[in-house]
A protein has these predicted regions:
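Beta-strand-loop-alpha "switch" segments that mediate conformational coupling across diverse proteins
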Residues: 74-113
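Inter-motif core of Ras-like GTPase G domains
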Residues: 22-43
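Short beta->alpha connector loops
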Residues: 1, 17-21, 41-42, 76-78
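NTP-binding/hydrolysis catalytic cores, primarily Walker-type P-loop NTPases
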Residues: 111-130
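Conserved beta-strand segments of the P-loop GTPase G domain that flank and frequently precede/overlap
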Residues: 13-15, 36-40, 69-73
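Catalytic phosphate/metal-binding cores of nucleic-acid and nucleotide-processing enzymes, i.e., regions
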Residues: 1-12, 32-34, 44, 54-62, ...
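Conserved C-terminal guanine-recognition region of P-loop GTPase G domains, centered on the G4
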Residues: 47-74
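Switch II (G3) loop of P-loop NTPases
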Residues: 5-25
Length: 130
């Protein structure tokens, strides 16, 4: 409730480390506009993502404006967005039309390149928060 009263805050970002069953995370969902769930397309990540969406369902009942947004993450460059959307289509959530690409560690150290590369992802997230 203190977060609701302090209207000077535009966005609060919390990294739950995948612990959506945590009581603190559940309480945050009651006053949040959106929860962003990053996922890769591995079998394990998909199972966790489906469980995360299910875990957050009760918060949606109490907070009808809560949007669950899926961010495709660590996606191989040869994978197209149609394949991603097809894989995630049964989730009761918004699937962002962008993907965070899989990266080879230590290949690209430029922060400017990273900023340009991730700008469309940030914009897609902001578009879903408006």
């Amino acid at each position: 409730t203190q977060l609701k009263e302090r209207r000077r805050i535009d966005f609060i970002i919390v990294d739950s480390a995948g612990k959506t069953t945590d009581e603190g995370i559940k309480k945050l969902c009651l006053v949040s506009d959106a929860v962003i769930v990053p996922t890769s397309l591995t079998q394990n990540d998909l199972l966790v993502t489906y469980q995360t969406v299910a875990d957050l369902a009760p918060a949606r009942t109490l907070n009808p404006r809560l949007r669950i947004i899926i961010l495709p993450n660590r996606i191989h460059s040869a994978t197209n967005i149609y394949t991603v959307r097809e894989t995630l289509k049964n989730l009761d959530a918004i699937i962002l039309p962008v993907m965070v690409p899989q990266k080879n560690l230590f290949v690209n150290f430029s922060t400017l390149d990273a900023e340009n590369e991730y700008q469309p992802i940030a914009q897609a997230i902001l578009n879903n928060l408006a």
